[in-house]
């Protein structure tokens, strides 16, 4: 499922590039997921497993000790796009891809698979989150985008527009965390069992 080696990856504005299928990003061992953007925003692996399934993925088994994090990138005040692919795999089905240091998530939350929270429910909680599929284990590819200066946010799932031009967000991601959040309950909250293939951050809005 990895995509970095292909011809269609946009490089303009790319500030973080993590791809489990590319040996330049993960050579097959160790606890570092290497940022291929050249900006040094490597992620640290905490008790997660690499698999060759779907070309290369990381398996997060769920629980507070099993997660992936980066604490060097901050797009909270920048225009942004988060491009990622992930899926829930079990009943521990809360957060997967999100911001480490702020309340930001793209994709999975509380059993739902099409959620986008950027310090506000983009598209609205009822229209965006509750209207989507719950308890799905299907892979999905997400684009969560935000233009901070114009207060406009877009959300695409498998290239399908979920929300366009919404005004409910307020920040991009501060850091990266996959598998839980560090914001509440003594840094141990909303863990998820799932798989992730790639995560890319851009410091601009990508258009469909």
Regions found by a protein language model. Give the residues of each.
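Short hydrophobic/aromatic patches on beta-strands that form ligand-binding or substrate-lining surfaces
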Residues: 16-20, 35, 80-90, 142-144, ...
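Short, solvent-exposed loop/turn segments at secondary-structure junctions
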Residues: 22-25, 89-91, 183
């Amino acid at each position: 499922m990895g995509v970095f080696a292909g011809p269609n990856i946009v490089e303009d504005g790319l500030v973080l590039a993590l791809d489990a299928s590319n040996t330049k990003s993960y050579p097959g061992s160790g606890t570092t997921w290497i940022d291929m953007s050249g900006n040094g925003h490597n992620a640290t692996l905490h008790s997660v497993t690499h698999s060759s399934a779907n070309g290369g993925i990381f398996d997060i088994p769920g629980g507070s000790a099993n997660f992936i994090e980066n604490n060097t990138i901050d797009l909270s005040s920048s225009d942004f796009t988060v491009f990622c692919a992930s899926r829930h795999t079990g009943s521990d089905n809360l957060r997967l891809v999100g911001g480490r240091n702020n309340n930001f998530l793209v994709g999975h939350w509380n059993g739902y698979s099409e959620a986008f929270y950027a310090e506000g429910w983009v598209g609205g909680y009822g229209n965006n989150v509750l209207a989507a599929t719950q308890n799905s284990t299907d892979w999905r590819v997400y684009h969560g985008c935000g233009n901070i200066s114009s207060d406009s946010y877009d959300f695409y799932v498998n290239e399908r527009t979920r929300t366009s031009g919404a005004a409910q967000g307020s920040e991009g991601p501060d850091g990266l965390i996959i598998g839980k959040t560090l914001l509440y309950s003594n840094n141990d909250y909303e863990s998820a069992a799932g798989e992730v293939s790639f995560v890319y951050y851009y410091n601009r809005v990508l258009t469909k």
